[in-house]
Swiss-Prot record:
It is a multi-pass membrane protein. It catalyses: Release of signal peptides from bacterial membrane prolipoproteins. Hydrolyzes -Xaa-Yaa-Zaa-|-(S,diacylglyceryl)Cys-, in which Xaa is hydrophobic (preferably Leu), and Yaa (Ala or Ser) and Zaa (Gly or Ala) have small, neutral side chains. It comes from Bacillus cereus (strain G9842). This is Lipoprotein signal peptidase. It holds the Pfam family Peptidase_A8. The gene is lspA. Belongs to the peptidase A8 family.
Amino acid sequence: MIYYVIALFVIAIDQISKWLIVKNMELGTSIPIIDNVLYITSHRNRGAAWGILENKMWFFYIITVVFVVFIVFYMKKYAKTDKLLGISLGLILGGAIGNFIDRVFRQEVVDFIHVYIFSYNYPVFNIADSALCIGVVLIIIQTLLEGKKAKE
């Protein structure tokens, strides 16, 4: 299925980008891309977003495995008839596995995309995080559109 190819693409880009950061940047260093907006910053995270649940790797292992099984089941059941859902789940699956690989092999997640939004220093993130968020946003949009159609 094409949706698994999307997941594999996300995993590949995520892992290659993280490898490049680890091999070429010292931890904590930053390269400005757009001053005061976008930086490439070598950062490590031993928790989830904003560092919550730091050093709780077993929790993340269990949750991720359960989550991945659920996503694969859901993809097999519903993605055949719903392309947007399939794309969304492919992005989510790739993102979940990308960060899982880091947790298993590094005991931390490599983050490097550093954004300032209206002077707010947003937590550093990575390609897997982006894919997860985009997938979730697409599902929310689809749900809202379906709700609107049902009302008509």
